[in-house]
């Protein structure tokens, strides 16, 4: 079956089309820009004051929740109880849309460190704020530099901290999962911390890749059963098993 390149979005009736366009450009866009500038600047200041962890847990989460709310996203989280308090995890999630970050950061109540592409470092305010909070930039064009970044990430993991990977490496432009890269699974094996497959549903209906056509709608994030690491764990098999769990969840 051929993968769809653009999933159907939430329908907006003709009577609501113009009011929603006004809401989108007069409310959503200004809030996204202002919240990133203002909260990002506050985060940078707090990081210089030694409050990076608080800024990440509280202000960054507030930023994400605010933006998801103004975009009229109805967020549902499932499987959160599968995660043990005080345990670190590697979270491996599919990546459908830019708004995946809002869902993970704003609604999971977890202390997260992100592994993100190097290009985001250049985004004004946001790039510096993420770096100061301890998120990890990876140069996808340089495998040696990417491995060095992942090694640095290992040093930042403490109890109750989770590292978020999008193992596809970029947003999927279709309904099919891309092949998974192995960095997340090598880190989990090296640190002996469980991998949690995370399936993100319907965010590409709220904001498809490569567009600014926001639509209101429900989205869902599911934490699947953690996969424990053992001395016999095979990296390739772990990667494929995680991908299979997420793929099956997306097709269900």
Which residues does each predicted region cover?
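Non-catalytic C-terminal accessory region of glycerolipid acyltransferases
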Residues: 1-15, 19, 147-252
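N-terminal membrane-anchoring alpha-helices
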Residues: 1-76
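Catalytic core of membrane glycerolipid acyltransferases/transacylases, capturing the structured
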Residues: 39-62, 68-71, 78, 84-143
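A generic structural signal for well-ordered alpha-helical segments
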Residues: 67-68, 130, 156, 188
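Short gly/ser/thr-rich secondary-structure transition/capping motifs
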Residues: 71-78, 146-147, 203-205
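A residue-level signal for beta-strand positions that form part of recognition/binding surfaces
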Residues: 74, 88, 218-220
């Amino acid at each position: 079956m051929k993968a769809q390149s653009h999933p159907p979005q939430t329908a907006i009736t003709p009577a609501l089309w113009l009011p929603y366009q006004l809401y989108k450009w007069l409310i959503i866009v200004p809030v996204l820009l202002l919240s990133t500038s203002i909260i990002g600047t506050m985060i940078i200041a707090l990081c210089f004051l030694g409050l990076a962890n608080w800024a990440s847990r509280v202000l960054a989460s507030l930023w994400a929740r605010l933006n998801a709310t103004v975009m009229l996203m109805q967020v549902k989280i499932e499987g959160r109880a599968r995660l043990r308090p005080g345990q670190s995890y590697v979270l491996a999630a599919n990546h459908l849309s830019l708004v995946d970050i809002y869902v993970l950061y704003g609604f999971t109540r977890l202390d997260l460190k992100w592994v993100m592409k190097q290009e985001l470092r250049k985004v004004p305010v946001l790039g510096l704020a993420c770096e100061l909070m301890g998120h990890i930039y990876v140069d996808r064009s340089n495998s040696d530099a990417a491995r060095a970044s992942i090694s640095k990430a290992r040093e930042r993991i403490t109890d109750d901290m989770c590292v978020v990977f999008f193992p596809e490496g970029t947003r999927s432009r279709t309904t099919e999962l891309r092949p998974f890269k192995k960095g997340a699974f090598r880190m989990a094996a090296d640190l002996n911390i469980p991998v949690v497959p995370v399936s993100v549903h319907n965010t590409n209906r709220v904001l498809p890749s490569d567009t600014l056509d926001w639509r209101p709608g429900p989205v869902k994030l599911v934490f699947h059963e953690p996969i424990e690491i053992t001395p016999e764990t095979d990296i390739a098999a772990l990667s494929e098993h995680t991908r299979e769990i997420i793929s099956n969840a997306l097709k269900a």
